[in-house]
Amino acid sequence: MKVGVTGFYPTVPTVSSSLFKEVLPFLKPEEFPDSASVLGAHVEGPFLAPSKKGAHDAANMHIPASSSLEDIYGEENLRNRIKVLTLAPELPGALTHIEKLYKSYGVRVSMGHSAADYEAGKRGMSAGANLITHTFNAMNPLHHREPGLAGERYPEYFWKF
């Protein structure tokens, strides 16, 4: 396929670890000659801020510091299926997970469903996160005294005079 949507990341919301392990094997990267290709999975959660959870099930949410990536998703899924993962960088242990996802598994980390302030967003970016999920939604608003995640990630758009 040469025009239009040529590839996409199917998204899995916050679910139980057993359901992640059941669903993710079906979302491996795969090319389809006459259709959009599956680029791998985008996983939202379970490391999200409870105050910004939106429709995500709080019963399945985890704190990164007390949860192993491998236990939640399975190592095979981390290596070969998950290509983008959204988490809240301000949670305890999130920076360690960001660095491990990026360096050990090659997963692109997106910050979202987060109550992070500018500094927490900056620490997330320094650890390896390079995307924002739902910019301006499920996060604190952009404010002139507290720019938050959006202000940290996209300063060139907001700070021009």
Q: Which sequence ranges carry the predicted segments?
A:
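A general structural motif
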Residues: 65, 89-90, 113-117, 139-148
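Divalent metal-dependent hydrolysis catalytic cores, especially in the metallo-beta-lactamase
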Residues: 1-22, 36-49, 78-90, 107-110, ...
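Conserved phosphate-binding/catalytic loop of the ribokinase/pfkB sugar-kinase fold
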Residues: 49-74
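Active-site-adjacent C-terminal substructures of enzyme catalytic domains
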Residues: 97, 120-161
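Surface-exposed amphipathic alpha-helices with a cationic face
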Residues: 1, 28, 96-105
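Active-site mouth loops of central-metabolism enzymes
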Residues: 12, 55-63, 108-112
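Distinct, well-ordered alpha-helical segments
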Residues: 20-24, 56, 69-73, 93-100, ...
